[in-house]
């Protein structure tokens, strides 16, 4: 069974290495150490399924919205996102599961009043967390939140940082996509 080794203080797929042969374990550990300032990392089962991402915002300790997005991925040693699109069609049950995972992660990491960027994988109808960070996503994801929901996401993040109570509710949605060339 393949494994994935992950640096815990990196992002953008840096320090994530798949290992198929346990005899290469030591060299893989040394490679992961190049991407971290910590003296530990995560080792987990390699999962195959449908990957998707999500943008979210946590305010007052509660997830205010979750916007699942599809990812355009460059496949090298590991997949690297090079673009995204919304909406990413998922059953409501899967979206609720992803939102619950986001809430649990935010609680565990003590994240509050911040954007959240998440990567998930869907395996046999179950949502697994690949990576979550207390930041807005890259590759035009903040702009896609603004376009999709028809509000200025940057303004909402600034309002929250100033201690205001921004309203993330929207009745409008505009499909959109962005990709690095």
Locations of regions flagged by a protein language model:
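A conserved helix-loop-beta module that forms one wall/lid of the active-site cleft
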Residues: 1-15
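Short beta-strand-to-turn element immediately C-terminal to the catalytic PLP-Schiff-base lysine
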Residues: 16-21, 57-59
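Conserved hydrophobic/aromatic beta-strand scaffold that supports enzyme active sites
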Residues: 16-18, 42, 129, 178-180
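Phosphate-binding core of ATP-grasp and ATP-grasp-like enzymes
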Residues: 32-40, 45-88, 97-117, 121-128, ...
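ATP-dependent carboxylate-activation loops
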Residues: 135-156
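Peripheral (often C-terminal) accessory segments that flank ATP-dependent C-N-forming ligase machineries
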Residues: 156-181
